Amino acid sequence: MYKVQYLVLFLSVLLLLTMYVGCETKASDVKEMTKTRALVVENTTREVLEIYAKKKLSSTDLLLLENLNKDLDKNTDLNKKAEIARKLSAKWYDLGYPAIAGAYAEMLAEWFPTPEAWSIAGTTFGQAIPQKEDAKVRDFAAAHAVTAFENAISLAPEDWTNKLNLALVLTEVPPQDNPMKGVKMLLDLDANYPDNARILFHLGRLAIQTGQFEKAVVRLEKSLKLDNNQPQIYCLLERAYRETSISDLADKAAEKCRNSIK
């Protein structure tokens, strides 16, 4: 989990479109929703998340976590504390609680603020965002992921991967006062990095989500041409080809899609 990687999120663009082109929302209502979300995030902490998560854990896992937390509290050497925090982050991640794992990764980044440390924290938080069944956890993770990626960008502004990951988070959980912010960031990234396979991949997926299938074909084909080691792209291409009535290419993409998930 500590290898810096591209954050892969399944964009909930239907929600974004509902907010953007649906019924007109009064500015006061938007401000109130934004205030409510901020309050929820403020009242949600790692400690609160741990209380609820521990109710579902085995006695063995509880004992291990308790001992690690005791070691974390009693140690004064920052390097030793960092090693314990890494173990706690890894354990919570393995248990299926990426938001809590992200909080410990965030702790590490605060102690040793490097671009990589903040990127790891943001990526870890990002893994909790698709957990839509718990809005509090999702909003908590998204808010902390945004902060982590912004910190990473401030330390390494030339690194486009953190900018991409930030855009993906903002597309997945759009700010209520600026729902198109993530999409605009993706388009800006494409303008600044026109031959970037990963950016084109996500723009192609976004185009499919929004029904712009011809645009999706162009973006995904260009992405694949730039990087042919993207097995997951064929599943998207199949859909784009089908919707644009390119049946022969859709069939070929479908076969490659099936092979990629075997």
Describe the residue ranges of each PLM region.
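Residue-level recognition of tetratricopeptide repeat
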Residues: 114-115, 159, 193-196, 213, ...
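TPR alpha-solenoid repeat register
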Residues: 84, 117-118, 162, 199, ...
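Short coil/linker segments at helix-helix boundaries
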Residues: 42, 48-52, 73-74, 78, ...
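N-terminal leader/linker segments that initiate helical-solenoid repeat arrays
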Residues: 2-99
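Structural marker of alpha-solenoid helical repeat scaffolds
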Residues: 111, 155-156, 191-193, 225-227, ...
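Residue at a conserved register position within TPR or TPR-like alpha-solenoid repeats
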Residues: 92, 124-125, 170, 207, ...
